[in-house]
Curated annotation (Swiss-Prot):
PANTHER family named among the record's database cross-references: PROTEIN SKELETOR, ISOFORMS D_E (PTHR24036:SF13), SKELETOR-RELATED (PTHR24036)
Region (Disordered): 451-491, 830-857, 1086-1106, 1426-1503
DM13 domain residues: 34-143, 151-258
Low complexity compositional bias, start-end: 830-840, 1452-1491
Subcellular compartments: Cytoplasm, Cytoskeleton, Spindle; Nucleus, Nucleolus; Chromosome
Biological role: Provides structural support to stabilize and organize the microtubule spindle during mitosis (within embryonic somatic cells) and meiosis (within spermatocytes). The role in mitosis regulation depends on the Ran pathway.
GO CC field: cytoplasm; microtubule; nucleolus; nucleus; polytene chromosome; spindle
GO annotation terms (biological process): cell division; meiotic cell cycle; nucleus organization; spindle assembly
Protein name according to UniProt: Protein Skeletor, isoforms D/E
Keyword field: Cell cycle, Cell division, Chromosome, Cytoplasm, Cytoskeleton, Meiosis, Microtubule, Mitosis, Nucleus, Repeat, Signal
Subunit field text: Interacts with Chro and Mgtor as part of a macromolecular complex forming the spindle matrix. Chro colocalizes with Skeletor (Skel) on the chromosomes at interphase and on spindle during metaphase.
Tree of life domain: Eukaryota
GO molecular function ontology, one term from the record: structural molecule activity
Gene: Skel
């Protein structure tokens, strides 16, 4: 409690602060005047009235009456037993006068102040006394234990956004003093807020700030402010006060107001103007410089007001000479207000001289002269309508040697000045000052000698005006100011008890039955913001996540790039994070049940940490604070419980998990992508359990609903509801893991092709790895991971290469590349065919037509690698270059295969924005067969020196570390493989045949021997740091980079003997991640070839027209026997049957879509069938070729056969870093055997010291153990125990797709047979694919781009160096969760079931759901800097391989996939681990191990 005698300046401070918002004063309707003392006894001259104690020094008389006839009547107080003038004190009248009461009072409200130094505790009675006759006209006794009103202290503010203060003081019924108030000013619509009840709601009222304005609050830094309740609102009408964000219905902090507070009534309630209690004098009228003051006990409260220029000060002080206004030696206060921040300053100065302060001399602050000498207390500062207002308090007496006392008994000479501030925020020489004597009497009765503030009404001091005023209108105050507290209906005296309320006081009750008169203003809607620069937040597609579980947590809005730019609404600081993404749009399907794990806070006492989750059709949210009419228009679908009475209670309530940004990092506005910003966030969770709600949208659910917070507005975003997940509207049209193949008709009769829809634009989609790859230091040690962990699209920047000189590798590479480069340059210079070529017979051209440059089409479709296309050169837009009957050539309906990707996932590499030049073909009567994967179609770019010699320069368009194709020949038809094309497929480029008068057969052109990149991919992000700094030193890796792929054969072109030595290529195990849907070609011969060993002389299927039988010598191939006329007549018509969906093997999540509308010319059905089922060319161990260049070169020298490799993708394992490290240890246990691609260990160590540790087991070793057919059907991986454990260890996160290999293959291939050219027939491989079908589906699921935050593994022995509850996510970020603590330390790995372990350690089913369910989706940012330079620990620190017992695959009922233990596809293993397995791997988590967990392993766990 604060007694007024101790803090008398509080009321005066409130008076001065009220002047800043005087216009808000109105009429108060509630009759509260303080504690009632009693009624005056009616003795003489009609004296009557009710006496109230306003505070310890103020008495209020309600409806005072006196006839004014007595000659010497005065107001008296005394402490004697009865009223008397002996020992009594005479009071000044309501006007401050000391004259006797000579005028008449009729129901006047009179306010009187006790003499200085006296309080109500010091007196016993109050009376109207006549001195001349010593007669008491009327009196009232004052009880000794009177509980008079006084200011009350309540709690301090504490909340979010930096809201804080010291204990708030309720000065009177309408005034609050908030000392040292702070607020960060970040919210867009924060207001001071009051209302009924104990917690803020949207039904409350905003109150003006200290300047009387209702603008959103600015930043406050420990500023003491005075707030006045508006109009007739009092503290008895409200139950709380705080800071509230009105637009978002968010409580930033509040305090409760206790009931029954005994506080003084405000001056407005007593009908007193502030001017009647304050003094004011004008100092300089031109700048409206005024000084206002009031003496309060031993101190004085002063307020300076002036219209100042920016960076100017105003000063006021006491002159050392009472007779003149002298500057030198004066004690002054210098004050100013910063217009930018609104902060005010008041500094105690001693004017030692006229110069600026220097070394304690001149006009200096007291603290610059002597420490702890500042005697000024700043109370308030404001900038109102351009006026600077500063209120401060100081003692009347001098407190140190630099101060001067202020006398209240006489006049004081004062000084003042206005001038600019210097760079040190100190005074410089004044511009305006008082040049003459100016004296002020500070102890006088309040007198307002200044212009009235705006909103104030003039005084009516004339007794004639008062007397002539009607009695009904004479209830003005003593000073003539109309009272603010004028009730509409005057209560009778019986309304109050007609006795003293000292002993039985009834505190004023809140008007619960009366509504606040102030009309509620509509809640403002945040104004729209600019959506430019919004982060690209990936939507959660309808197939993600597979289990339908969403984690809803809180996090920051992301600055101007986040919530405001995404939604168009202003964010107030926090918003929902769904699966780790900032307010993503969610796609769901009707009829499917979804689960939302809510972690938004469960403490309703702290509204800023209480965010129930619910789904409705309302785009705003905040259902709890809506009006009843607004609630009726909202339909809620999930997250609430509605009782029978209609009461709605939120159910989506759980513990609080908050994504917390780095306080020391840059602000969110500095991040250009959400991925980069997300890496700075750390998930922090309170103790407790999350809330879980389920939702199943049905046919009545609208297409768009919204997820929001039940108690706050604008925290969530949209949910799109679809009927099916397969439709484009289902969110799949842009999924990175889905590709849709369609066929569009092309019109051959029109020169310009039909425009292609932009949704079908065949451009490369962005591919996102499912795991973060290793850093650059790790790449230097593992070449295999370098090649496997790269993207598959795009072209990297041109890089420099360096190869160690004077080595055998350099010489070998130089010889091979020199020949290839020379051949490439010759073909680039001479694109036209030479009719005089020695190996090419000239062909007559009776229908020669001029060449026409093909028309560029708008799309850039993907074409088929190795597919042979026929080029038809059109002479005119309307006619074909070669006449063909329309009945046999329906080219108008020609369908082109175009691979479409979603528009938001289409990637535009730089090289795709320009078309390759088409070589000028010489006119020929036949159709050109063109291979689109040749660099002959590339523009001849200027060659630049990149660190290699002329013949060692890699191809200009080849990416770094990509296998390339060297000179070689490929027969027709080539395997079809899709690669991104940089040029469109023109109608004349599609393969079809044309009739000629000479009936020439289709020529099979030899494929030019050019270096072709089989991979088009931008440089991996993990390579960028060291690639940019310096050229990457390629010492052992150069050979594998340049020579990987099909080896160069520089022998004779027609050397059939050499080609006969090519052995059949066995099938190899390839980690299945991202393969194209392909099958195996059938061994059906297209052409009858002499000497061939085909299954039968099958006749070719004519594509569209008949073929001539005229024999023409061909290059590299014997003359084929053309079909006869009878055979041609018996052929089926060339009708385009469309692409058959049943011929597609869906792999890696790709779902081709085939449009079958219309017919057209295409390849024969046999070719299409074979291509559809074509799997990767089963080459020899290409992984071993990529292992080191030494292995590759040794195989070329030691082997007698030339291995032929088809282009093939080498996908990255889902956790390749761990896989490689484990493999390096395990391979030492395998005994190597002879292989064409292996060398003795001594040779390896001589050429490459680390190569011996990089050797993988050979194929013979991998399949050294025989398995019967039953085992083959049961296990797709027929390998030995050790090898099986190796495979499981290597690929914990991906299922390995293994192609079964016959044990003994001795058949020599015949290059003229399709069977030997493309591997086994379709029937042989189709049986293998049936066994692998389950694995393929699992691989497709594991290959998805979803990446999850996984809870900690409770089965591992905890590391003492890692704090309990801390773990690392997939990208190396720490997650702090106080509830995710590890169980007691395990002595040894046990073999108990996982669920039994959970029960043993007391895990509830809800905790199991949280720990075994992914929590957020893919992360697409860049690798943080700390991991780019992190040195990986040795393999032995965290790799302890141990053999596993043979396990039985687990079949998932949801997808029908074969799942192995320790696969990421399941949350728990159902197989039993061998009890002999003692390595940590045997008890590892059922989920994939993070690649960054190596940083947490203890040093003592080395192998």
């Amino acid at each position: 409690m604060l007694a007024m005698k101790d803090k008398p300046w509080l009321l005066l401070f409130g008076l001065l602060a009220a002047l800043s918002c005087l216009a808000s004063f109105g009429d108060a309707a509630y009759p509260y005047y303080g504690t009632k003392i009693g009624a005056l006894t009616r003795l003489h001259h009609g004296v009557s009235g009710d006496v109230y104690a306003v505070d310890s020094r103020t008495i209020f008389i309600k409806k005072f009456n006196y006839d004014g006839e007595a000659p010497a009547a005065y107001f008296y107080v005394g402490n004697t037993a009865r009223p008397s003038n002996e020992g009594a004190a005479r009071l000044r009248d309501e006007r401050g006068g000391t004259a006797s009461l000579t005028r008449r009072y009729r129901n006047k409200d009179v306010t009187l102040s006790l003499p200085e130094g006296k309080t109500l505790r010091d007196i016993k009675w109050f009376s109207v006394w006549c001195d001349e006759f010593a007669v008491n006209f009327g009196d009232v006794s004052i009880p000794p234990n009177l509980d008079f009103p006084r200011p009350q202290k309540i709690s301090a503010l504490r909340g979010v956004h930096g809201v804080s203060s010291d204990n708030i003081v309720i000065v009177d019924a309408q005034t609050l003093l908030v000392p040292n108030f702070s607020y960060d000013g970040e919210a867009p619509d924060a207001k001071f807020w009051v209302g009924r009840g104990q917690r803020p709601t949207s039904d409350g009222l905003r109150i003006p700030d200290e300047n009387g304005k209702e603008n959103p609050l600015r930043r406050y830094e420990r500023k003491t402010i005075v707030l006045t309740l508006p109009e007739d609102l009092t503290i008895f009408d409200i139950g709380h006060f705080g800071v509230w964000c009105e637009a978002f219905t968010v409580d930033f902090g509040h305090v409760r107001l206790p009931e029954g507070l005994n506080v003084p009534p405000s001056l407005k309630m007593l009908g007193i103007s502030p001017q009647s209690k304050l003094n004011c004098e004008v100092l300089y009228d031109d700048l409206a410089f005024e000084v206002r003051w009031a003496v309060a006990g031993e101190s004085i409260v002063v307020q300076l007001v002036a219209k100042l220029e920016p960076n100017h000060y105003m000063s006021f002080g006491i002159s050392p000479n009472k007779n003149i206004s002298q500057m030198i030696g004066a004690d002054a206060v210098v004050a100013w207000v910063d217009p930018q921040t609104g902060n005010g300053f008041a500094t105690d100065y001693f004017l030692e001289g006229k110069a600026q302060c220097s070394g304690g001399r001149g006009a200096c602050p007291d603290t610059k002269i002597s420490e702890k000498t500042n005697s000024i207390r700043l109370l308030n500062a404001a900038m109102v309508n351009g006026y600077s207002i500063v209120t401060y308090q100081r003692s009347l007496a001098a407190t140190d040697r630099l101060d001067l006392p202020i006398s209240i008994t006489g006049a004081e000479s004062v000084v003042w000045a206005i001038g600019p501030l210097n760079d040190y925020q100190e005074v410089s020489f004044h511009t305006f000052y008082n040049k003459h004597l100016h004296q002020i009497e500070f102890g006088r009765q309040p007198k307002w000698n200044c212009p009235l503030p705006e909103g104030a009404r003039g005084n009516s001091n004339s007794s004639e005006q008062e007397d002539s005023a009607p009695a009904a209108q004479s209830s003005t105050g003593g000073a003539g100011y109309p009272p603010a507290g004028r009730p509409n209906v005057e209560p009778d005296e019986e309304f109050y008890e007609n006795r003293a309320e000292a002993l039985h006081r009834q505190p004023p009750q809140r008007r619960q039955e009366t509504a606040i008169i102030t009309q509620r203003r509509p809640v403002p809607t945040p104004k729209p913001v600019n959506s430019n620069g919004a982060w690209d937040i990936p939507a959660i597609q309808c197939h993600e996540p597979e289990d339908g579980v969403f984690y809803a947590q809180m996090g920051p809005t992301g600055g101007k790039h986040g919530y405001p730019a995404i939604t168009g609404h202003v964010g107030w600081g926090i918003s929902w994070y769904i699966n780790g993404l900032l307010i993503p749009e969610i796609h769901v399907v009707r009829g499917k049940t979804y689960t939302f794990v809510v972690e938004g806070g469960n403490n309703p006492d702290i509204p800023a940490k209480y965010h129930p989750f619910y789904i409705s059709d309302d785009p705003v949210g905040g259902y709890e604070h809506k009006r009843e009419e607004e609630k009726k228009a909202v339909r809620i679908y999930a997250g609430v419980h509605r009782s029978r009475s209609g009461q709605v209670t939120p159910t989506g309530v759980g513990r609080l998990c908050n994504w917390t940004p780095d306080v020391e990092g840059p602000p969110a506005d500095d991040y250009q992508s959400f991925g980069a910003y997300q890496r700075t966030l750390t998930l922090k969770c309170d103790a407790g359990e999350p809330g879980v709600i389920t939702w199943k949208p049905d046919r009545n659910t609208p297409d768009t609903v919204y997820y929001h917070c039940f108690t706050h507005r604008y925290l969530g975003w949209k949910i799109h509801v679809h009927d099916s997940c397969d439709s484009e509207a289902g969110g799949l049209k842009g999924a990175a893991s889905e590709r849709h193949e369609i066929r569009l008709p092309a019109k051959a009769t029109v020169a310009e092709p039909a425009p292609v829809h932009e949704d079908y634009a065949g451009e490369a989609s962005v591919r996102h790895e499912t795991k973060v790859s290793a850093n650059d230091n790790f790449l230097l040690k593992h070449q295999t991971d370098l090649i496997k962990n790269h993207n598959m699209n795009g072209t990297p920047p041109k890089l420099s290469f360096e190869i160690t000189k004077s080595s055998e590798i350099t010489k070998l590479i130089s010889d091979g590349i020199r020949a290839a480069e020379a051949l490439e340059e010759s073909l680039l210079r001479n694109p036209n065919l030479n009719p005089n070529h020695p190996n090419q017979n000239p062909i007559p051209n009776p229908h020669q037509k001029p060449n026409v440059t093909p028309t560029e089409i708008s799309s850039r479709p993907e074409i088929l690698l190795g597919e042979t296309h026929a080029h038809t050169l059109n002479a005119s837009p309307s006619a074909s270059a070669y006449p063909s009957p329309s009945a046999t050539l329906p080219s108008a309906n020609l369908k082109l295969p175009i691979l479409a990707a979603g528009p938001h996932l289409i990637h535009h590499p730089p090289h795709l924005h320009r078309l390759h030049h088409q070589p000028q073909h010489a006119p020929h009567p036949h159709v050109h067969l063109h291979h689109h994967n040749l660099t002959a179609n590339l523009p001849a770019l200027a060659q630049k020196t990149i660190g290699l010699s002329e013949f060692l320069r890699p191809p200009q368009n080849a990416p770094l570390f990509h296998p390339v194709k060297l000179p070689g020949r490929r027969p027709f038809p080539a395997p079809i493989k899709k690669v991104p094309a940089s040029r469109p497929i023109l109608p004349q480029q599609h393969p079809h045949l044309h009739p000629h008068p000479q009936q020439h057969p289709v020529l099979l052109q030899q494929q030019p021997s050019l270096i072709v990149s089989h991979y088009r991919k931008p440089i991996p992000g993990l390579l960028k740091p060291f690639v940019k700094e310096k050229p990457f030193p390629l010492q052992p890796l150069a050979a594998s980079v340049l020579l990987l792929g099909q080896p160069t054969e520089l022998g004779g072109l027609n050397n059939k003997g050499e080609r006969l030595k090519i052995k059949g290529k066995p099938k190899i195990p390839v980690p299945y991640v991202d393969l194209e849907p392909q099958g195996s070609l059938q061994n059906t011969a297209i052409f009858n070839q002499p000497g061939g060993k085909g299954k039968g002389d099958q006749k070719p299927k004519a594509s569209s027209v008949s073929i001539s039988t005229t024999p023409i010598p061909l290059v590299k191939r014997p003359t084929v026997k053309e079909p006869s006329q009878e055979e041609i007549a018996s052929m089926r018509p060339a009708v385009n049957q469309g692409f058959k969906p049943d011929t597609v093997i869906v792999e890696s999540g790709f779902k081709p879509i085939v449009r079958t509308d219309g017919t057209g010319v295409q390849l024969p059905k046999e070719i299409i069938d074979q291509v559809a089922h074509r799997r990767e060319d089963p080459g020899t161990e290409i992984d071993e070729v990529m292992e080191t260049d030494t292995l590759f070169l040794a195989a070329q020298q030691g082997g007698s056969e030339t291995q032929s490799f088809e282009p093939m993708f080498i996908p990255s394992p889902l956790d390749s870093t761990n896989a490689t490290k484990v493999l390096r240890v395990n391979v030492k246990e395998v005994s190597p055997t002879a292989s064409a691609l292996r060398l003795p260990s001594a040779a390896l160590e001589h050429a490459l010291p680390s190569a011996s540790e990089l050797i993988k087991p050979t194929l013979d070793e991998l399949f050294a153990e025989d398995l019967n057919e039953e085992e083959l059907e049961m296990e797709p991986m027929p390998v030995a125990d050790d090898v099986e454990s190796l495979e499981e260890t290597t690929k914990k996160d991906a299922v390995t797709t293994t192609i079964n290999i016959p044990r003994n293959t001795t058949k020599k291939p015949d290059p003229d047979l399709l069977e030997d050219l493309f591997g086994p027939d379709e029937e042989e491989l189709y049986a293998d694919e049936l066994e692998l079908d389950m694995d393929d589906r699992v691989a497709a699921a594991a290959e998805r781009i979803d990446t999850y935050y996984l809870p900690p593994d409770n089965r591992k022995i905890p590391d003492t160096r890692v704090p309990s509850g801390a773990l690392y996510t997939f990208d190396g970020k720490s997650v702090v969760d106080s509830s995710l603590v590890l169980p007691p330390k395990l002595d040894a790995p046990d073999n108990a079931n996982v669920h039994q372990r959970h029960a043993q350690y007391g895990l509830t089913p809800l905790e199991q759901l949280v720990r075994t369910t992914p929590q957020f989706g893919v992360y697409r940012g860049e690798l943080p800097q700390e991991f780019r330079g992190t040195e990986p620990q040795p393999v032995s620190e965290y790799s302890h391989p141990a053999p596993f017992s043979r396990t039985t695959p687990v079949f998932s009922s949801s997808s029908g996939s074969t799942i192995y233990p320790y696969s990421s596809s399941t949350g728990a293993s159902t197989s039993t681990v061998s009890s002999s397995a003692s390595s940590p791997l045997s008890s590892s988590s059922l989920r994939p191990i993070s690649t960054k967990l190596q940083l947490l392993k203890p040093e003592g766990r080395r192998a």
